[in-house]
Every structure is written in C-alpha cells, then in structure tokens.
C-alpha cells in the first residue's frame, strides 16, 4: 500500500476583525499587512492525498467537493493548503489563478527551525511586504537572522529578528558591532511572549501559560 500525503485546508476564521480579508488575493493581504498565519485561520478540512499528488491537484479536488464538507466556508481564494510530503510541510495560498508558496504560517515549525536560511515569502508583523532570510548568526547561544525585503522597488533596509520571530532592529550593514550590541540588549531585555512559551516546553512543564485558553 502506498503511503499517502496529508493535507489540511486552513480558512480565515469568522472573527469580525478578519471579515474584510476573506476571499482576497495574496497581493491584497501583503499590501494591507494582513498576517497569513495560523492566528488568523482555522482548520476547514483535512484529508489524505495520493503520494505526490501535489497542491494543484488538491486544489482541483477541493473545488469539486460539496461546500458543506468545510467547517468554516466554501473552499476558495484566501484559503491555505498545508501539504505534508515525506514529513515536510509546505504552505500554499489559494489565489485566483495560482497557488503562492509561502513561509511562516506557524510561528515555529515542529522541527524547531522557523526562519530557514535562503527561504523567502515570510511576513513580519509590523513590516510591509515579504522577506527572505539572507543571513544568520549566533549570539550568546541564541540564533538571530537577517531578513532582506523581497520588494524590488526602493526596498526598506534589512531587519534582524530573533529566531522566535521577534523583531530586534533594522540594519544597513548586516551583523555589525551596532547590531550585535542590540541583539545582546534584546537578550537582556524583557522576554517576548513566544520565548515565554518555549521556556515551558524546555522545562517540560504541563503549564502552557495564557496560551492554553486560545488553542484551536
């Protein structure tokens, strides 16, 4: 028996704040700073596909099945296909005439690496457009990455993020002395929420802080 690929259809949730972003194009979301992340989506459908079937074929199949099968709304533009092939999950945004492969749907992937070197299509909260991971460095045992804007016309300066996805600083000169100083200050400062959750996982405590109330 051939092993199958697993796929999940994520759909923008029914919250009032996300109403105007439903059924919009990828470009619209990027321009308006709507974060295409699990925070704004719920699971609409999940299933298995013949190995190697691919996202395009899954899209066709989803377009042909009964709309009532979806938990949130009929399948269509603004949905996300999460396809796991041989243990690796890729995410595709359903646009009108294409599928856009992008990164960063889950804040931190199960494998532990969220910001993958030389991968693009990441959105960064509070920053316009999409970003590519262009460099990485370790400071005091913590990983930081440099992100380059994928905007071709007048791109904004590069930025440095902590591996948790937290913003550290803008940089014109990559990991220079000034940037390293800011990374150290970041590590000394109050820890962002994400790190707070990671601490619990590291301690192996069942306690999941505030997050537990909001789990899908």
Protein language model annotation of sequence segments:
Residues 2-50:
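Extended boundary segments
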Residues 12-14, 53, 68-70, 77, ...:
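Charged, low-complexity intrinsically disordered segments
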Residues 20-34, 92-96, 160-161, 168-176, ...:
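Short amphipathic beta-strand/extended segments with alternating polar/hydrophobic composition
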Residues 28-32, 56-64, 178-188, 207:
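Polar/charged alpha-helical tracts
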Residues 37-83:
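Short, conserved turn/kink motifs that form compact alpha/beta structural patches or helix kinks used as
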Residues 74-106:
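Short, compact, well-ordered microdomains
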Residues 105-216:
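Extended intrinsically disordered terminal tails
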């Amino acid at each position: 028996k051939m092993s199958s690929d697993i796929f999940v259809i994520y759909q923008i949730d029914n919250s009032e704040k996300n109403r105007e972003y439903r059924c919009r194009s990828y470009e619209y979301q990027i321009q308006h700073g709507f974060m295409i992340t699990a925070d704004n989506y719920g699971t609409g459908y999940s299933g298995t596909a013949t190995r190697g079937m691919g996202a395009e074929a899954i899209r066709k199949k989803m377009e042909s099945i009964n709309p009532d099968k979806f938990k949130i709304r009929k399948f269509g533009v603004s949905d996300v296909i999460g396809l796991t092939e041989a243990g690796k999950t890729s995410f595709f945004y359903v646009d009108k005439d294409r599928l856009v492969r992008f990164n960063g749907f889950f804040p931190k992937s199960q494998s532990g690496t969220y910001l993958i070197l030389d991968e693009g299509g990441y959105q960064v909260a509070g920053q316009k457009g999409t970003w590519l991971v262009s460099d990485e460095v370790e400071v005091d045992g913590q990983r930081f990455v440099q992100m380059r804007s994928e905007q071709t016309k007048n791109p904004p300066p590069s930025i440095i993020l902590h591996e948790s996805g937290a913003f550290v600083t803008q940089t014109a000169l990559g990991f220079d002395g000034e940037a390293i100083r800011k990374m150290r200050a970041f590590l000394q400062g109050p820890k962002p929420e994400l790190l707070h959750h990671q601490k619990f996982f590291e301690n192996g405590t069942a306690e999941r802080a505030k997050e537990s109330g909001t789990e899908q």
